[in-house]
Amino acid sequence: QKTIVRNREKLYNDLLELSALSDDFKVYNSCANFVFVKTSFGKELWNYLKDNSIVIRFMGDYIRISVGTEEENEELISCIKTYLSR
């Protein structure tokens, strides 16, 4: 459980850093094993990540990102950074 909390906090902080790349990418922390992001391009990001073998949950104006291993989270952050930098 401590690993999940640590990985969630790192994922949240990494996503917060990425939010500087887009005004339409608001990150919300949680006490569970996921992080919410509010964005109008959630469907496009969901498809982009799916094409890169990363699965997140698309929920209309939000996406839900489950906490993974440190390596999985790093790959996710790298893909989102690439997407936001296009």
Residue ranges of each PLM-predicted region?
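Conserved PLP-dependent catalytic core of the aminotransferase class-I/II
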Residues: 1-26
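Short beta-strand
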Residues: 26-30, 56-58
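A short, structure-level motif marking secondary-structure boundaries and short turns
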Residues: 29-32, 73
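Conserved beta/loop motifs at nucleotide-recognition and modification sites
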Residues: 35
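PLP-dependent enzyme catalytic core of the Aspartate aminotransferase-like
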Residues: 43, 48-57, 61-86
